[in-house]
Amino acid sequence: MNRITIAKIILLIVFFTVFKDNSFNYEIDKIYPKLLILRFNNKKYMNDELGKISYRYEGLSILDGHNFPASFIKKSDRIYELVKKNNIEYVIGIYDSESFLHEKLHAKYYFNKKYKQKIDKEWNNMKVSKKNKIITFLKNLGYSDKVLIDEYQAYKYSEKDNFFNLD
């Protein structure tokens, strides 16, 4: 092999190593047909693509998974056309399977009125001291007031029993 061929091979290896993970796949959910699920190949690219939208919605941009109503997507966001074309109301984004349940629970809270009523009732009937501990915990994670109940239910049903350190 000559030097030019070796240089081309090295360049291709570097190119595919650097750029291979900057992609995502998408699917329309079968249970909630107005839900768009974005599956990213790496966390950094996911946060680069969805972080600004999540920040508009919940006050955080660097996350292990993203969820937001489509109304928070601007024309300048790269996923705008995909969302518009498919008449999407809600989006979740993940880069690994560990965060899928958590993000899907956000969609359930958004789409399933009975489930939302059940969670809201549970929250409203909770002892004030317990609720205040959960609020403090979630605010320390950086969540805004408007998503506290939604985050509470997603963590409660996707994490270990004592996730909120209430014991």
Each PLM stretch: what is its role?
Residues 98-111:
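Active-site recognition of the HExxH zinc-binding catalytic motif
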Residues 110, 114, 160:
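Glycine-rich, acidic and aromatic/proline-enriched surface loops and short helix-turn segments
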Residues 8, 12-91:
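A metal-dependent hydrolase signature that marks the N-terminal structural subdomain at the beginning
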Residues 6, 33, 46, 75-79, ...:
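Short amphipathic alpha-helical segments that mediate assembly, nucleic-acid/protein binding
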Residues 114-123:
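Short acidic alpha-helical/loop segments enriched in Asp/Glu that coordinate divalent cations
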Residues 1-8:
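N-terminal Sec-pathway targeting helices
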Residues 84-91, 123-167:
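Metalloprotease/metallohydrolase-associated module, dominated by Zn2+-dependent proteases
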